[in-house]
Curated annotation (Swiss-Prot):
Main location: secreted
Glycan-bearing residues: N110, N161, N242, N295, N333, N340, N352, N408, N429, N512, N523, N559, N578
Residues cleaved off as propeptide: 606-614
The organism of origin for this protein: Aspergillus ficuum
Protein name as annotated: Acid phosphatase
Originating gene: aphA
């Protein structure tokens, strides 16, 4: 690609503000169905009683009337420096600025904070959805800053344009950096709805029993699996839903929900009991999943970062290219001679992380990062860093148009694009093939360099994609090339990830996957050997419609893996005890027991030092 062409394209594509907003290219028309629906038996938006069941989840605020015309359906909390952000969602606009009344006394909410609203032309719109309490299209952001640390505050969302006033709710602000008290965090990845009921139950329990916050490392809701129920079972995919004849990877017992007979007219398929993860509509998957999580996101901050399932409406075609026929030519239950899915195959509202950017609000703007993609925050003795393992680095899994073009092109042709093309969400100055050209790399370097290890001796980084695993994939090399050097240089203690749908704890690894034997005390205790090695944990077992991962033919455990569990679902509990010890525990979803534990120790002379890199 010519340098001038690349520069022009990157200027057009790069984000221009810290709070990224989706930019969707529409040079070529979308030619698929008005509303893609993954159910040939019931291809309706609201359901006709046939086909796959249509779920209903309670909204965050119970409406005061039986037939509301607007409602607050989702409420979620997230940290901002010295405060809290309150995000809430409604099907229709408020007719005024969103607001929150708040105070320290639940009987005297004597302060009011206002914010802003945003929306997108979702497919289908909420005006096409009959149930007002099951749809979100307007997203409201209210930040309350200047708050006291480690303090409980109360708040209420007032009624506006037909919504019902919320109950008086509460949140607890973050502990200040350096606070010596112990705390726990719920860490999860790859959580949909199907196969995640146990994880959800344990997560709700954790949220009510004092867990400080939840940290979800990508793949939220599995909205892009809306079409799994129309894909016939295939030999190269281990999931086949067929009632009591269903087959799933992992080797565990068949979940009860899979024993339900297929609805009349449906075929054995690559999906699950709902067709898609929760719904046969992309946007309804998002709506239902967020409402299912209300009893967590209302109680504790829910911090998120991007995964591959947030990028677009689909990742791949199915048998006989059934999705190409449907999305490109509006032919239901058809076939196509070739897989021809492109960036333009998805409805415009289902491209380029659009839903993800609207449905959450992370502290990118406040921490020098970008939107929900990369940001950091302190809590007590730890500094937490969320990075984007999907876009915005060289050879990223979801690349941008600049990597599609050839010759002197400034934009790719339709056929040169891929369905998951996304970003960049930060600025790019230089070649797209050099990670140091990307804003994210420079932000990460600056963020890690500023960490005061005398206050936050523990530094934990998470992205969706692992750097290493016994299940090797080429993206792991690119993630390492982008970030591993910085993490080692600045003495990061642990790198957390998901993407692979199992639990895999690795031995401490230095550059190029060298096992740091000096950091291994025993199989369940490591030293934080800052600058020499990093503890890597793959935490992708929360549960979703795709079930567990399996090794490909010829693969198996390698010597970097200390423990592998590809049978159980669950999340992980990270407990920071003090400046020299933390504990990591796998919490099994089926019974809440501990399936694995790791203690990470840090010598006191290292924990108190500010400079941990050469």
């Amino acid at each position: 690609m010519k340098g001038t062409a690349a520069s022009a394209l990157l200027v057009a594509l790069s984000a221009t503000a810290a709070q990224a907003r989706p930019v969707v290219d529409e040079r070529f028309p979308y030619t698929g169905p008005a509303v893609p629906i993954g159910d040939w038996v019931d291809p309706t938006i609201n359901g006709n009683g046939k086909g796959f069941p249509r779920l209903v989840e309670p909204p965050a605020v119970k409406p005061a009337t039986a037939n509301p015309r607007n409602n607050v359906n989702v409420i979620s909390l997230s940290y901002i420096p010295k405060g809290m952000h309150i995000h809430y969602q409604t099907p229709f606009g408020l007719g005024q600025l969103p607001a929150v009344r708040w105070g320290k006394d639940p009987r005297n909410l004597n302060s009011t904070a206002q914010g802003y609203s945003h929306t997108y032309d979702r497919t289908p719109s909420c005006s096409q959805v009959k149930a007002v309490t099951q749809c979100s299209q307007f997203f409201h952001e209210v930040s309350i800053d200047g708050l006291e640390p480690d303090t409980t505050y109360y708040y209420q969302i007032p009624a506006a344009n037909g919504t019902t006033q919320s109950e008086v709710l509460s949140f607890k602000t973050s502990r200040p950096a350096g606070h010596p008290g112990s705390f726990s965090v719920a860490v999860l990845n790859d959580m949909g709805y199907t196969n995640a009921h146990g994880t959800h139950k344990q997560l709700v329990k954790a949220a009510t029993e004092g867990t400080a916050f939840a940290w979800h490392g990508g793949d939220l809701s599995y909205a892009d699996d809306w079409y799994s129920g129309i894909l016939a079972c295939a030999d190269d995919w281990p999931v086949c839903y067929n009632g009591t004849s269903s087959t799933l990877p992992g080797g565990g017992p068949l979940p009860e929900e899979y024993k339900k007979p297929l609805p009349a007219g449906e075929i054995p398929d690559q999906g699950g009991p709902q067709g898609g993860d929760m719904s046969v509509l992309y946007e309804s998957n998002w709506d239902l999943w967020q409402q299912w999580l209300n009893n967590v996101t209302l109680k504790i901050p829910y911090m998120v970062l991007p995964g591959n399932h947030e990028a677009s409406c689909a990742e791949f075609d199915g048998p006989h290219n059934i999705l190409t026929a449907y999305l490109n030519d509006d032919i239901a239950n058809g076939t196509a001679p070739t897989d021809n899915l492109t960036y333009y195959s998805c409805p415009p509202s289902q491209r380029n992380f659009t839903a993800y950017q609207h449905r959450f609000r992370m502290p990118g703007p406040e921490t020098g990062g970008v939107g929900n993609f990369w940001y950091s925050f302190d809590y007590g003795l730890a500094h937490f860093v969320s990075i984007d393992g999907e876009t915005d680095f060289a050879n990223s899994p979801e690349w941008n148009f600049a990597e599609d073009v050839t010759g002197n092109e400034t934009l790719p042709s339709e056929s040169e694009t891929f369905i998951t093309d996304s970003g960049p969400f930060g600025n790019v100055n230089g070649s797209v093939h050099e990670t140091k050209s990307y804003e994210q790399w420079h932000w990460l370097q600056q963020d890690l360099a500023k960490v005061d290890r005398s206050k936050t001796p523990w530094v934990i980084v998470m992205s969706h994609r692992p750097m290493y695993s016994s299940a090797y994939s080429s993206y792991q090399l690119h993630v390492r090339e982008a970030f591993e050097g910085l993490l080692l240089k600045y003495g990061v203690d642990a790198y957390l990830s998901g993407h692979i749908h199992w639990y895999e704890r690795l031995y401490p690894l230095g550059a190029n996957g060298t096992i740091d034997t000096a950091a291994i005390v025993n199989n369940n205790t490591y030293y934080a050997h800052n600058g020499k090695s990093i503890t890597h944990i793959i935490n992708g077992m929360a549960g979703n419609i795709e079930s567990h991962s399996e090794f490909s033919d010829g693969e198996g455990l390698t010597n970097i893996t200390a423990l592998l569990d590809k049978v159980h679902y669950g999340f992980s509990k990270l407990t920071i005890f003090n400046e020299t010890a933390l504990k990591w525990e796998l919490i099994r979803g089926d019974d809440g027991t501990v399936g694995d534990s790791l203690t990470l120790l840090k010598p006191s002379h290292v924990a108190g030092g500010k400079k941990l890199h050469s």
